[in-house]
A protein has these predicted regions:
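A conserved short coil-to-beta-strand element within the FAD-binding core of flavoproteins
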Residues: 125-139
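FAD/FMN-dependent oxidoreductases across multiple families
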Residues: 66, 237-301, 321, 326, ...
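Conserved FAD-binding catalytic core of PHBH/FMO-like flavoproteins
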Residues: 114, 157, 161-268
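Active-site-adjacent segment of FAD-dependent monooxygenases/related oxidoreductases
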Residues: 39-117, 216
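Glycine-rich FAD pyrophosphate-binding loop
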Residues: 22-43
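Core beta-strand elements of the Rossmann-like FAD/NAD(P) dinucleotide-binding domain
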Residues: 3, 147-157
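Helical substrate-recognition/capping region of FAD-dependent monooxygenase/halogenase enzymes
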Residues: 1-4, 8, 24, 33, ...
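N-terminal Rossmann-fold NAD(P) dinucleotide-binding loop
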Residues: 14-15
Length: 524
C-alpha cells in the first residue's frame, strides 16, 4: 500500500491527525485540494485542552508567543459592562493554561504544518480526492493532481478532514443533517479604541444580535465578529464603512475606529454527519460537524477528534490492537458533537432571535442572570470546564471501566485525568504530571501504593508506570482533586481514564487491555 492512512484535508484537524500518526510511526499521506495553507481565518480561540495537547506536540511555547491570552470574558449591554467570566481565576488549578488563547487558524496551521514537516511528512497541495472504493482490506483513492491527471493510491484507512464540503463524506454517502442559519455574519480586523476591557473577550448584546471583540497582537488591534443588520443582509458589495454606524449604535458605547485591514461576510450552518465512520473511512472536524461560533468550540473540537482517533489508528495499524478498538471513535465523539451542536444552537438562537421578547431577555435579563451565576463557584467551574473542553467525558464508552469501591466523588473512567503537581520521589520537587505522562503510550498511575515490581505482563513498551507516594504535599494535592488513597488510574494515550479502581490489580489491568482495548496480549 502507498500509505497506512490517507488524510484528506490539511487544515488544523488533518494536520493534528497527521502529526499524531507520525509520532507513532504510522505512514500518512496528506492531501489538500487548495493551493496552500489558509491566509485568512475566522477561527480564533484556542482552548485550554488544545494547549495541553500542543504541549505534548512541542508547539505550545511558539503558540503562546504568537497568540494573545484572554483571561476573561465581559458582557456588555447598552454601553455598560454587566458581567465578567474570570477564566484565569477559575481555571488556575484545573489546567496549566487557564485562559483562551486568541490565535488565528492560519497561525495554528503554520505551527502544525511546521511540526509535521519536522517529522518528515509534507502536504501534497493542489491534490483533490475524486473517487473512493474500499474492500475488506484497503481503500483505493482516485486523486486529481495539479497537472489535471488522475492517479490512484491505496491505503488501509481514510480520514476525511476536508471541511464542510467534504469529498470523503459525499463519496461515502454519509448524510450531513442540518441547515444554514438565516443570519449573515461579518468579520473585520480593525484598529479601534474605546471602553472595552483590554486583553479580554468583549461580548456586546443588542436587540437583534451580538458583536464579539477579540484582542489581537499589536496596539489597539482587535478582531470584530458580528451580525449584519437585517437591511444589509442582501448586500454583496459591503465594506466595513457600511456597518460602522450600526456597530457604534448597537455596542452602545464610544468607539473610535481607525483602520480596517480585512473585512468579509459569511453565513454559517449547523449540521452533523449521520455517522462518523463507514468501515475504513472516518470523518473528523468540519467534515463531521459544523455549528455556530458561540464559545469558540469548532476548531478545538476537530483537534480533539483527531487526538481521539490517532492513538487508536496507530495501535491497529501496528497490529497491537484489533480493529474493534476503532468502533470507540464514533461512539465517543458523535455524542460530543451532537451535544455541542445542541448547546451552541440553543445559545445562538437566543443571541440572534428577532423576537422582541428574546431581545428583551437578551438585553435586560440575561446579563443579570450571568452576573449572579458567575458569583457561584459551582457554576464558574462548570463554565470553565465546558468552554475549555477539559470537561469532556466518555463515561458510556466501551473503553471506560470503574471498578467497585472507588468513591463517587473521585475521577471516574472516561474523565480527563486532572492536572496535578506531584512528587514522584520522597523530598523531590513537585512536577507537572502532564509533562511526565507519555501520550504515545498508556500510563498507569499508582497512588499511595506500590506499583507491580515486574510491571504488567504483556503490555511491555505500551505502558509507562508512575508511583505517587504519600506525603504531605501529595496528600494536599490529591485531596484537592478528590483522589483517594490508595487508588490507581490507567490513562489512555489521550489522557482520559480507561480503568480506575482502589487497590492495584495487575490481572484487572490485563483483562481490561484484552477485553476492552482489544490489545493482543500473549497468554490472554
Amino acid at each position: 500500500m502507498d500509505a497506512d492512512v490517507l488524510v484528506v484535508g490539511a487544515g488544523p484537524t488533518g494536520l493534528m491527525l497527521a502529526n499524531q500518526l507520525a509520532r507513532r510511526g504510522v505512514r500518512a499521506l496528506v492531501i489538500d485540494r487548495h493551493a496552500g495553507p489558509s491566509l485568512q481565518t475566522r477561527a480564533l480561540g484556542v482552548q485550554a485542552r488544545t494547549l495541553e495537547i500542543y504541549a505534548q506536540l512541542g508547539i505550545v511555547e511558539p503558540a503562546l508567543r504568537l497568540g494573545k491570552r484572554a483571561t476573561g470574558a465581559n458582557l456588555w449591554v447598552q454601553g455598560r459592562r454587566t458581567a465578567r467570566i474570570p477564566l484565569g481565576d477559575i481555571g488556575r488549578d484545573l489546567s496549566p493554561y487557564p485562559f483562551l488563547l486568541i490565535l488565528g487558524q492560519d497561525d495554528n496551521e503554520r505551527l502544525l504544518g511546521d511540526a509535521l514537516r519536522d517529522r518528515g511528512t509534507a502536504v501534497q497541495w493542489n491534490t483533490e480526492l475524486v473517487g473512493l472504493a474500499q474492500d475488506a482490506n484497503q481503500f483505493r483513492a482516485s486523486l486529481k493532481y495539479p497537472d489535471g491527471t488522475i492517479g490512484e493510491v491505496t491505503a488501509a484507512w481514510v480520514a476525511g478532514c476536508d471541511g464542510a464540503r467534504s469529498a470523503v463524506r459525499e463519496l461515502s454517502g454519509i448524510a450531513f443533517e442540518g441547515a444554514p442559519y438565516e443570519h449573515v455574519f461579518f468579520v473585520a480586523d480593525i484598529q479601534v479604541t474605546g471602553s472595552m476591557m483590554p486583553d479580554e473577550l468583549n461580548v456586546y448584546l443588542w436587540r437583534e444580535g451580538f458583536h464579539l471583540l477579540f484582542p489581537m497582537r499589536g496596539a489597539d488591534h482587535w478582531r470584530l465578529v458580528g451580525i449584519l443588520p437585517t437591511h444589509l443582509r442582501e448586500r454583496h458589495d459591503l465594506k466595513f464603512e457600511d456597518v460602522i454606524a450600526s456597530v457604534r449604535q448597537e455596542m452602545g458605547t464610544a468607539m473610535s475606529f481607525k483602520e480596517c485591514s480585512w473585512f468579509s461576510t459569511y453565513r454559517i450552518h449547523h449540521r452533523c454527519a449521520a455517522r462518523f465512520r463507514d468501515r475504513r473511512c472516518f470523518l473528523l472536524g468540519d467534515a463531521a460537524h459544523i455549528h455556530s461560533p458561540v464559545g469558540a468550540q469548532g476548531m478545538n473540537t476537530g483537534l480533539q477528534d483527531a487526538y481521539n482517533l490517532a492513538w487508536k489508528l496507530a495501535l491497529v495499524v501496528s497490529g497491537g490492537a484489533g480493529a474493534a478498538l476503532l468502533d470507540s471513535y464514533e461512539h465517543e465523539r458523535l455524542p460530543v458533537a451532537r451535544r455541542l451542536l445542541s448547546t451552541t444552537d440553543r445559545a445562538f438562537s437566543l443571541l440572534v432571535s428577532d423576537n422582541w421578547l428574546a431581545g428583551l431577555f437578551r438585553t435586560r435579563v440575561l446579563a443579570k442572570i450571568m452576573a449572579f451565576a458567575m458569583s457561584l463557584d459551582r457554576i464558574r467551574l462548570f463554565a470553565f470546564r465546558t468552554i475549555s473542553q477539559t470537561g469532556i467525558r466518555y463515561p458510556q464508552s466501551a473503553l471506560s471501566e470503574t471498578l467497585a469501591g472507588l468513591r463517587d466523588s473521585a475521577p471516574r473512567a472516561g474523565d480527563r485525568f486532572p492536572w496535578l503537581r506531584l512528587r514522584f520521589q520522597p523530598n523531590s520537587p513537585t512536577e507537572n504530571l502532564f509533562a511526565r505522562l507519555d501520550d504515545t503510550r498508556f500510563n498507569l498511575i499508582a497512588i499511595g501504593q506500590p506499583a507491580p515490581a515486574d510491571g504488567v505482563p504483556g503490555l511491555g513498551d505500551l505502558l509507562r508506570i508512575h508511583e505517587v507516594p504519600s506525603d504531605a504535599a501529595n496528600d494536599r494535592e490529591l485531596a484537592r482533586a478528590q483522589i483517594p488513597q490508595p487508588s490507581f488510574y490507567l490513562l489512555r494515550p489521550d489522557g482520559h481514564v480507561g480503568l480506575a479502581g482502589t487497590h492495584l490489580d495487575a490481572a484487572a489491568v490485563i483483562r481490561y487491555a484484552s477485553e476492552r482495548l482489544h490489545l493482543g496480549i500473549n497468554g490472554v
